From Swiss-Prot:
This is UPF0102 protein PERMA_0362. The lineage of its organism: Bacteria, Pseudomonadati, Aquificota, Aquificia, Aquificales. It comes from Persephonella marina (strain DSM 14350 / EX-H1). InterPro entries: Restrct_endonuc-II-like (IPR011335), tRNA_endonuc-like_dom_sf (IPR011856), UPF0102_YraN-like (IPR003509). Gene3D superfamilies: 3.40.1350.10. Pfam families: UPF0102 (PF02021).
Length: 116
């Protein structure tokens, strides 16, 4: 299966999970010259930037382990651009990771912050 198809399926599952958990989905696949954010949601007034990673097994590690410092910096820069472009001020921002292994969803809240 193509990795982008698998990635979209993982993102669809993550969106469903977030909605069922009471999050409001603001955007999906927000792109800028800095990078891409998989999901931007709102949770009780907090803007939540979500990176989704999925794998079929943990044989070669957990999905979230593939997010390196370079990827984190790209996510942060893209999030800053998003907030500026949408003129969002005065709201808390949180960076989460949703890791999916064999249809099991693990939600890692506050995975990193703007000072990373």
């Amino acid at each position: 299966m193509f990795s982008w198809i698998k990635g979209k399926e993982g993102e669809d599952k993550a969106v469903e999970y977030l909605r069922n958990s009471g999050y409001r989905i603001l955007e999906r696949n927000f792109r800028s010259r800095f990078g891409e954010i998989d999901i931007i949601a709102e949770d009780n007034g907090t803007i939540v930037i979500v990176e989704v990673r999925s794998k079929g097994s943990t044989g070669y590690g957990y999905p979230e382990e593939s997010i390196d410092h370079k990827k984190v910096r790209k996510i942060i820069k893209t999030a800053q651009f998003y907030l500026l472009k949408r003129d969002i001020k005065g709201k808390q921002v949180r960076f989460d990771i949703i890791s999916i292994v064999n249809n099991n969803i693990f939600h890692i809240k506050n995975a990193f912050d703007l000072d990373y």
